Amino acid sequence: MFSLENVCAVKREGAPLAIHPAKVKLCTGAVPGSAGRMTRWPLPAPMALALDQARLAAAEGEVPIGAVIVKDGAVIATGRNAPRAHHDPTAHAEIEAIRTAAASLRNERLDGCELWVTLEPCAMCAGAIVHARIARLYYAAADPKGGAVEHGARVFDQPQCLHRPQVYAGIGEAEASELLRGFFRARR
């Protein structure tokens, strides 16, 4: 099983690397190299797969967001944004992946599962993560306007939140951000 506990050695400016498990553990996707340069490490396979799902969403005219659910080191579900295709405003990548994983496991609780997603989840998706009991959330790009993990509603920080996954941010951030920027640039 992939774990970032010993990998994340760099902190984002002004933010601690590791805080309370309910808070975000920030990773930049790079580690200090020689002569002060930053050396990138390869993307973890689940995030690379989530980025592939995001590219598929973009090719289908959807906002390029992809998600992957892993249990015991194996991918059990993938999802990508599909609100337009499904005529369903709830068809976000995370929700699509959670639905597939729950059906695959024949259980609404996804205990021990990891969710890898290319963008910080919105309030709806963060709520679904809570209800599904996802153990760990890894996301690439922050979403200051619509995110609800480290921005906005901060769902996992609310006293009413009954389950708080471990959260890791910034893994594949550059790739996910560029994919989103390119998609919206082409739309303008």
Could you describe each region identified by the protein language model?
Residues I65-G73:
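Short beta-strand scaffold segments in enzyme catalytic cores
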Residues V7-A9, P21, T28:
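Short hydrophobic alpha-helical segments enriched in small aliphatic residues
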Residues K71-D72, R99, D111:
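A cytosolic small-molecule/anion-sensing beta-strand core signal
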Residues K23-E60, E108, P121-R188:
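Zinc-dependent deaminase
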Residues I76-P83:
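Short beta->alpha transition motifs characteristic of CBS
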Residues F2-E5, E13, K23:
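Charged/polar low-complexity intrinsically disordered segments
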Residues N107-L119:
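Immediate flanking context of iron-sulfur cluster ligation sites
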Residues A85-I95:
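A short, polar/charged loop-to-alpha-helix boundary motif
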